[in-house]
Design a protein with these regions (language model features):
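Short, membrane-interfacial amphipathic segments enriched in basic
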Residues: 1-6, 286, 351
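Hydrophobic alpha-helical transmembrane segments of multi-pass inner-membrane transport and secretion
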Residues: 14-43, 304-340, 362-378
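Hydrophobic, regular-secondary-structure patches
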Residues: 37-111, 118-121, 135, 252, ...
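Beta-strand-rich non-transmembrane domains
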Residues: 103-108, 129-140, 163-186
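Short beta-strand boundary microenvironments
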Residues: 109-157, 255
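Mechanotransmission and gating elements of multispan inner-membrane complexes involved in transport
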Residues: 171, 180-307
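Glycine/proline-centered hinge or cleavage motifs at structural transition points of membrane proteins
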Residues: 340-342, 347, 353
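Short juxtamembrane loops and helix-capping segments at transmembrane helix boundaries
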Residues: 379-393
Length: 393
């Protein structure tokens, strides 16, 4: 049998292109369903663990899936916005603790998450380097952001404009990075956290500039009265918040009407949760209160229905590939009749021919198994990042 393996090995080594093609076909057919299973299992674990740890999520009426994906996984799809009035209403009810979220802007392709310090306690996030948020304009970044951008506490990060040509004249905000979070293996690793007021600064709702009442620049001040000062377009807003200008930052309009993308709602107990869900089921309400776990269950059900369809397609392709491989080996036997005749002449039997063919198939299957195993180990190692890239973000 060892002689048969040696002869088969020399044959497959000589016919490199044919052997490589057969190995590639077998490997692809084997690895596709296994990789899909690995990624879907990891995605289910990541999606459900985050969703089930979030009791309730408040947002504007519309797509519950968009709300959950933005509020929990910081997806780029921005849901309909709510206002700070929704947070105040929840606080006044005394039934839950609200945590506001404003996930709309980016900094070098990483989402800027405007929130409060309660969010870090809720998610169990701790600082590994530097300190926690303390002042307007400061940022704390996730471990993955720090690694990919090579940024540490003490560096700075600039917000990205929503469009290339920003006609609204909103300037990018330079944010000092005061802390780096300990790796949590969640979407929080890929986020830039700021105070919710800082997110409003990025949008231009809160801004700072020089004191017009003291300005003597005629090109900046158009008109001045005892009660009002009118500024021209030459008035430049600050693009960085420092100790010197932080007091000049102010709001325009009512803060209760300032936007949020979602509100995490942590009810006091099950009874409080039931009361709140009942209140927000009323049709005249402009807001919806969803259970993230239920929404993600629906998403996963759809994903696994698609997986079943893909499995059926892969199964059909596998059958077609097996038939094609059988045809290749059958034709190979016909083309190698002279070789087999030589084996017979030197005293070999039909069993020897069978051993040679079985050895060739075994070598091809073994090589395919090694490649498949190596690829699956790589997929398993990077499955968390792959799931975030393919399914979550």
């Amino acid at each position: 049998m060892i002689d048969s393996f040696y002869i088969a090995w020399r044959y497959v080594a000589f016919n490199k292109i044919r052997t490589a093609t057969l190995i590639a076909c077998v490997t692809l057919i084997a690895i596709l369903p296994l990789t899909l299973e690995l990624l879907l299992t990891e995605s289910e674990q990541q999606l459900l663990s985050r969703a089930e740890s979030t009791p309730l999520l408040l947002g504007a009426r519309g797509s519950a899936l968009d709300l959950v994906m933005n509020g929990l996984y910081f997806d780029d799809e921005i849901p309909e916005l709510v206002s700070m009035a929704a947070v105040n209403e929840l606080e006044d009810s005394g039934l839950a603790m609200p945590i506001p979220l404003y996930v709309r802007f980016n900094a070098r392709r990483f989402p800027i998450v405007g929130t409060t310090l309660d969010y870090f306690d809720f998610r169990g996030l701790t600082i590994e380097q530097g300190r926690q948020l303390a002042l307007l304009g400061e940022a704390v970044i996730g471990a993955e952001v720090a690694g990919r951008l090579d940024i540490a506490a003490g560096d700075s990060l600039v917000s990205s404009p929503e469009t290339v040509f920003d006609l609204a004249g909103i300037y990018p905000l330079k944010m000092p990075v005061v802390g780096v979070l300990k790796r949590s293996y969640t979407p929080d690793d890929l986020a830039v956290f700021v105070d919710v007021k800082t997110a409003w600064v990025v949008q231009g709702l809160v801004h700072g500039h020089e004191d017009l009442a003291r300005s003597e620049d005629a090109s900046v001040v158009i008109d001045r009265t005892d009660s009002n000062v009118v500024a021209s377009a030459r008035l430049v807003e600050y693009t960085e918040i420092t100790e010197e200008n932080v007091d000049s930052f102010h709001v325009h309009g009512e803060p209760d009407q300032y936007p949020l993308s979602a509100v995490i709602v942590i009810p006091n107990d099950d009874k409080s949760a039931a009361i709140l869900r009942g209140r927000y089921q009323e049709s005249e309400r402009l807001h919806q209160l969803v259970v993230p776990g239920t929404v993600i269950d629906g998403l996963l059900a759809n994903i696994f229905r698609i997986k079943n369809l893909l499995d059926a397609v892969i199964f059909i392709v596998a059958i077609a590939t097996a038939l094609a491989l059988t045809l290749v080996f059958t034709l190979s036997i016909r083309l190698r009749q002279r070789e087999f005749q030589t084996v017979f002449r030197i005293g070999g039997s039909r069993l020897t021919i069978v051993r040679l063919l079985v050895s060739e198939i075994a070598i091809i299957m073994a090589a395919s198994a090694v490649l498949c195993g190596t690829a699956l180990l790589a997929v398993d190692h990077y499955s968390s990042d792959l799931v975030r890239m393919l399914f979550i973000r």
